[in-house]
A protein has these predicted regions:
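Hydrophobic transmembrane helix bundles of membrane-integrated enzymes that assemble
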Residues: 2, 8-29, 34, 44-209
Length: 209
């Protein structure tokens, strides 16, 4: 067991980690959505990450004691991931690691639910803004991905790439299924499949030109 003394979480620590999950999920999503650049500039996104890390750090060590072996393991893995992230100039894995260690002896369902709600909200906002921008013909170039010698045009729904939108949508479907796994029915899976197919065919824009 990583704990020397397993102390129950108080309400303050729960709120800390909830806020951290919201901030880090928000950062990971908006960094892939160019239409949010005017609302969440890069400096603001960096502030979100730093605040998220601080809150998780406070959450992990508040009124808890860990074994030396556990602390050394966490430091080594964190250092390795930080070095890798710096070399790759991509902090997704490092952020995911922080979120993972924060869930130790924590309600995983609560974490998944928060990520699901934040992701779904951001996706809805991105879809709405991108469709509005397309309709009023404002910066359409950031909404359309052109491939195969301009023969394939795909609507990004505000994301940096249509495949990124598909990944987030797939993650939402998986989280939805996991959250309702105790009462999962065939029509839930059918609904998720329908949503995936609907957006897959909707993003192809040949018919809009």
């Amino acid at each position: 067991m990583p704990y020397l003394n397993n102390v129950p979480q108080n309400k303050f620590s729960i709120r800390l980690f909830d806020i951290a999950i919201v901030l880090l999920t928000l950062k990971m999503l908006v960094s892939s959505i160019p239409v949010f650049d005017f609302v969440f500039p890069q400096k603001f996104q960096n502030i979100l990450v730093i605040l998220g890390y601080i809150l998780i750090f406070l959450h992990i060590f508040e009124k808890r004691k860990y074994t030396l072996q556990f602390i050394i393991s966490i430091i080594l893995i964190t250092t390795l991931l930080l070095y890798t992230s710096i070399q790759m100039q991509n902090y997704v894995y490092f952020t995911s690691w922080f979120m993972l260690i924060g869930t130790i002896h924590y309600d995983l369902r609560r974490v998944i639910k928060i990520i699901f709600i934040v992701s779904l909200s951001i996706m809805f906002i991105s879809i709405f803004i991108s469709l509005l921008m397309y309709i009023i013909d404002y910066k359409r170039e950031i909404l359309i991905n052109i491939r195969r010698n301009e023969t394939v045009r795909a609507f990004t729904f505000g994301f940096i790439h249509p495949n990124k939108f598909t990944i987030v949508l797939s993650n939402l479907c998986l989280m939805f299924i996991w959250l309702i796994k105790d009462r999962l029915k065939y029509y839930h899976v059918t609904f998720c499949l329908f949503i995936q197919l609907f957006f897959y065919f909707s993003r192809r824009l040949e018919q809009l030109y």
